[in-house]
């Protein structure tokens, strides 16, 4: 279905493209998606918050109290700057964030934010961020 989607992609509006991608995903991986729906919307470690789209950072250390599930999966604005934990998210294309339409890697704001959405459906690459717990450093692999 991936090739079928790529062939249609150029002729579809963004909303139609998203709808078509969702339809094909359910057709190919419906059982997997149903299983994944039972997972929590975020994962938190001592140093990181991993979330699909983002959190309400204005809540500071109480971010979870003020962040809706809808925001965790649908946030469309990019957060930048220092936060008390690293926020690792996807959802927003790193090409869009970087201002480089062909960029497909991990984008880091130089402080607390890492964005991983490398537009895999187009690039064929899955950006992977590795964290070394001994050094506290990240690297793209």
Question: For each predicted feature, which ranges?
Answer:
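Hydrophobic/aromatic beta-strand positions that recur at structurally equivalent sites within the blades
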Residues: 129-131
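Acidic, His/Gly-enriched loop-helix segments that form or flank divalent-metal centers
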Residues: 2-125, 134, 139
